[in-house]
């Protein structure tokens, strides 16, 4: 987890500076203290920001919220809810998909989306 925290913090700092945000201004926009934000950026925070705060950070920086949430070691709240609503089926699906390539996962996602659309058609 230490390397993940450091990598997330490094990426966050690089993107924040590239977008021209000061540490104080960005902390204010994300609703955290500048001290905590500094600890996150240096990989020294005891815990990563919440999934919701990471989503806000990503959106402010023009980054993909899901990718950034994963980079921070968090899980999007909606995904957590989906898993909790289907406590047997969802873990089984994820285990079955383990080891698939990114291309295979994208294709599987498309198949599931098509299946969902079929279920909505009259």
Language-model regions, residue ranges each:
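Short C-terminal boundary/hinge segments that cap the last helix of small helical domains
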Residues: 62-78
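A short, Lys/Arg-rich alpha-helix, primarily the initiator
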Residues: 1-18, 105-106
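The alpha-helix within a helix-turn-helix
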Residues: 16, 27, 58
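DNA major-groove recognition helix of helix-turn-helix/homeodomain DNA-binding modules
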Residues: 51-67
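DNA major-groove recognition helix of helix-turn-helix
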Residues: 41, 49, 72
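Short alpha-helical DNA-recognition segment
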Residues: 20-40, 68-70
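Interfacial/linker helices and their anchor residues that mediate assembly or domain coupling
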Residues: 73-122
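Helix-turn-helix DNA-binding elements, focusing on the entry/boundary residues of the two helices
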Residues: 12, 23, 34, 51-54
């Amino acid at each position: 987890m230490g390397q993940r925290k450091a990598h997330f913090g490094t990426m966050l700092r690089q993107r924040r500076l590239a977008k021209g945000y000061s540490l104080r201004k960005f902390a204010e926009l994300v609703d955290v203290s500048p001290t905590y934000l500094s600890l996150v950026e240096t990989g020294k925070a005891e815990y990563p920001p919440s999934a919701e705060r990471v989503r806000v950070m990503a959106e402010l920086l023009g980054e993909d919220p899901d990718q950034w949430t994963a980079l921070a070691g968090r899980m999007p709240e909606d995904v957590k809810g989906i898993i909790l609503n289907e406590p047997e089926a969802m873990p089984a699906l994820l285990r079955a998909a383990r080891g698939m390539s990114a291309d295979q996962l994208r294709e599987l996602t498309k198949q599931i989306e098509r299946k969902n659309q079929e279920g909505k058609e009259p």
